Amino acid sequence: MASSIVSSAAAATRSNVAQASMVAPFTGLKSAASFPVTKKNNNVDITSLASNGGRVRCMQVWPPINMKKYETLSYLPDLSDEQLLSEIEYLLKNGWVPCLEFETERGFVYRENNSSPGYYDGRYWTMWKLPMFGCTDATQVLAEVQEAKKAYPQAWVRIIGFDNVRQVQCISFIAYKPEGF
């Protein structure tokens, strides 16, 4: 019994020493109530969080029925000659080589022989003449578009801007779509 009293007394002195050397955590800090807390509230309407003053005017850009998506800017109405000239001038200003391509069957990506993308899925069109290396006049490119439209009135015609230094296609847009598309 004496041994049990001694051991319990020794344990008591050890715990007192440990308690005396412990420092209370967060001594001198402010309470947590003053810190900003981010809480996720699942029933908050997100439309009430941001406002631009009610000046939103939404425009449907892509009707999904009976409307194929072709290339860049295809969701817009057909470009006028002035708008085409503006796009061609942008292409030339960046130093890209204009190139015209046309497609007589389908002007959109399709997969007929295989479900995975490949060469025969409508991405590669027939080139109209040669790329216009050295061309600096947008009206010359537009004249070629008019000539391609006259030669193939039921074909899609697109203009490509090719960077011959990096050897990449930088811009591509539809210049002409046949009637009904």
From Swiss-Prot:
Q: Which GO terms describe its biological process?
A: defense response to virus; photorespiration; reductive pentose-phosphate cycle
InterPro entries documented for this protein: RuBisCO_ssu (IPR024681), RuBisCO_ssu_dom (IPR000894), RuBisCO_ssu_N (IPR024680), RuBisCO_ssu_sf (IPR036385)
Q: Does this UniProt record's set of keywords contain Disulfide bond?
A: no
Q: Which domain of life is it from?
A: Eukaryota
Q: Which Pfam families match?
A: RbcS (PF12338), RuBisCO_small (PF00101)
Checking SUPFAM superfamilies in the record gives: RuBisCO, small subunit
* Broad class of where this protein is predominantly found: plastid
Q: Where in the cell is it found?
A: Plastid, Chloroplast; Cell junction, Plasmodesma
Q: Name one GO cellular component term.
A: plasmodesma
- Segment annotated as transit peptide: 1-57
| Molecular function, one GO term | ribulose-bisphosphate carboxylase activity
Do you know which CDD domains this protein is assigned to? RuBisCO_small
Which keywords appear in this protein's UniProt record, sorted alphabetically?
A: Antiviral defense, Calvin cycle, Carbon dioxide fixation, Cell junction, Chloroplast, Host-virus interaction, Photorespiration, Photosynthesis, Plastid, Transit peptide
Key word Protein transport present: no
Q: Which family does it belong to?
A: Belongs to the RuBisCO small chain family.
Subunit (UniProt): (Microbial infection) Binds to tobamovirus movement protein; this interaction seems required for viral systemic movement.
Q: What does this protein do?
A: RuBisCO catalyzes two reactions: the carboxylation of D-ribulose 1,5-bisphosphate, the primary event in carbon dioxide fixation, as well as the oxidative fragmentation of the pentose substrate. Both reactions occur simultaneously and in competition at the same active site. Although the small subunit is not catalytic it is essential for maximal activity. Involved in antiviral defenses.
Q: What other remark does the UniProt record contain for this protein?
A: The basic functional RuBisCO is composed of a large chain homodimer in a 'head-to-tail' conformation. In form I RuBisCO this homodimer is arranged in a barrel-like tetramer with the small subunits forming a tetrameric 'cap' on each end of the 'barrel'.
What's the protein name?
Ribulose bisphosphate carboxylase small subunit, chloroplastic 1
At the highest ranks, the source species' classification is:
Eukaryota, Viridiplantae, Streptophyta, Embryophyta, Tracheophyta
